[in-house]
């Protein structure tokens, strides 16, 4: 020990202090389900991906039941471009035809999903890759998106093709995996009762899974630090009512609106709390769950 430099001792002491201070939070989440939506630019960074996998492994070792739901939009766009498949857009939304949904399923369920599974397994845990089709876990229906036509100022329904929303969730498989000490990693692909395959927004998919399981927490790893006030500062905690008011007064705007609305729907569906946090930082999951002040914006009922 005499050979260890003082700064090394300081680092070790800080690590020990963190572990000690984390104990009550580990106890708080023991045997609880935490759904983590993994997405954003962090997915394209190997070092952050490995850190994320280690965090998930640590959650499992701490007695938490983590469930990972992932997206993969940038990789899908990249693959479509490589394959020479052009995308068509309606009011800024991608139309997913039969050819594109096959590529989406290949990329999400066949490529990205298995990469995340491999990273978690490399940390000594048992992760298993799934999508909504497995065990009839999720059934979807076609999304009917209504927009205002700028020319006529009247409503019209967009046909986005094979874009769906979850309407039925059977938790049997997920409950079984929790009892068998496995970590589910789920791609947001699901069948419809019509026999077709649907691509589902990963945020909405994660919210539906978390609601069906009455999860203790749903974490959205994003490219932003949380919900910001008008001065650009992170709001540490919001109630559903406060979040709705911030949408009304324009504080919450743009792409953050559908994300916060998904948080609200998840809470109304049975989730105790939903957190929006920055997935581009080191160990955001541990900082949120195992520290006093958390790492993002917590939305509660």
UniProtKB/Swiss-Prot annotation:
InterPro entries: AceGlu_kinase-like_sf, AcgluKinase_fam, ArgB, Asp/Glu/Uridylate_kinase, Glu/AcGlu_kinase, NAGK-C. It catalyses: N-acetyl-L-glutamate + ATP = N-acetyl-L-glutamyl 5-phosphate + ADP. The keyword Zinc does not apply. Pfam families: AA_kinase (PF00696). The keyword Repeat does not apply. Keywords: Amino-acid biosynthesis, Arginine biosynthesis, ATP-binding, Cytoplasm, Kinase, Nucleotide-binding, Transferase. Its EC number is 2.7.2.8. One of its GO terms (biological process) is arginine biosynthetic process via ornithine. One of its GO terms (molecular function) is acetylglutamate kinase activity. One of its GO terms (cellular component) is cytoplasm. Pathway: Amino-acid biosynthesis; L-arginine biosynthesis; N(2)-acetyl-L-ornithine from L-glutamate: step 2/4. The record marks 37, 259 as: Transition state stabilizer. Catalyzes the ATP-dependent phosphorylation of N-acetyl-L-glutamate. This is Acetylglutamate kinase. Gene3D superfamilies: Acetylglutamate kinase-like. Belongs to the acetylglutamate kinase family. ArgB subfamily. It comes from the Bacteria. The lineage of its organism: Bacteria, Pseudomonadati, Pseudomonadota, Alphaproteobacteria, Hyphomicrobiales.
